[in-house]
Each structure stands twice: as C-alpha cells, then as structure tokens.
C-alpha cells in the first residue's frame, strides 16, 4: 500500500477537488493507498485570514475522511525572523514541518495546492511531487505566464506534468505528464483570429488589453485545467501499482530508470472521455 503524504494550503475549491478525486478512487477500491495525514500551513485560527471559510470547508473534508490534520501556521511561526531573514525562517519552518509530520511515515508526498516554497532539507529528505501546468521542458512560471509564452512561441502542444519538488522551484525532474494538441479543430480559428489582431498590434499590446480574456488563452487554459485532476489521480495510481517510482529524485519503473517522464496522456484522455 502506498502511503501518500498530503500537503495543501486549502485555500479554495481546487484543494478540495484534488483530495476528493484521490479519495473517491481510494474508497471505490481503485487505489491501494493510505493518506496518513494532511498538512496545512494555516491553523485557521489566524486573525488575518481571508480564506478562513474556504479553508474550514477543506478542514471539514479532511476530518470527514478520518485523516489526521496537521497544521503549523506560517503566519504565526517566528514572525520576527521571517521579517528579517526569510531564508533562515524557511529553514526553521521546514524543521517544524518535518517534526509535525514525523509521527506519520509516508512513501510519497503530494503538494496539492501547497503555496509555500519547501526548504532544501525537506526536499532532500522526502520524495514529493508538485503539479506544473506545462509539458516537460516547457515554460516555467504561473499558468498564466506559461500560456502566454506558448502563444508567443506559436506552440503546437500544451500539457501538465508532475515533477519532483527540489530546492530549485519548478526545476525538479518531470516524473509523469499528459499532453494535448493546441492546433486543429477548435484551435485553428483562434490562432487565425490572433494573426488578424497581430496585423495592427503587437502581441504585448494584445496581452495587456485582453490578458485572461483572450479566446485562445481561455481555450488553452480550459483544456489544460480539466486534465489536472486526472493527471494527479493517474500518477498516484501508477505509483500505487508499482508502474512508477522515484529513485535518486528521477523517474523509474520496476526495471530501472526511465529515459524521461512517464506519459499518461492516453489514460488522462480516457478518464475525460476524449477520443
């Protein structure tokens, strides 16, 4: 049985949906896993807490599943040190995190909407996965930045990957991924519309004016976002049944190291009913 440590900031529906997607498959008997704890970097007792109601819904879900909830409030942890030396604070917070989860051994950590940067020692001690909204070797940054970079490059494909959490943000080895075309039916007319706009404006001007409302941007985001939940669950399934593992922070299977990340595109599309 795979012991899956769960780390989440619990700030909205996305955090709940990720946990529910994995637990639904566990409870149906489809995933041979245990989640020994859920760690959150908020206690929900903080005075300044704009996501209190959303986080309480997340906490209620965790408790409803009977999973131990472990919290270390980042806002209340050594606040003076955080103001004067953030790097030193991150090291100390990492020590507190590791101590807090030490009663709950786990095989693989899942950063599921976890919004703090993990310290170096925690990354070294545990194998942990993070979701990044791009293909292996693709753009870095937020999902917004990724999509606009793809548009600027006139890319043919987009996707999402699960990568190892390392000291360098978004630089760990890609472990699993799914991809999809951003050309063809449903896309070609949007690229053509962009080309017409580029006859009178630069891409930067279009980006500034439309940003999150650009039709091509929205289509790429829609098709990428709907793949994130099944990518997470299919990745967990691959680890649970032994098809995938991490050795020395690199992807491997039963026979040894893989040449690259494990391609879950077909399984993700099947889960979505995409032909």
Residue ranges and their predicted role:
Residues 1-275:
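One-carbon transfer enzymes
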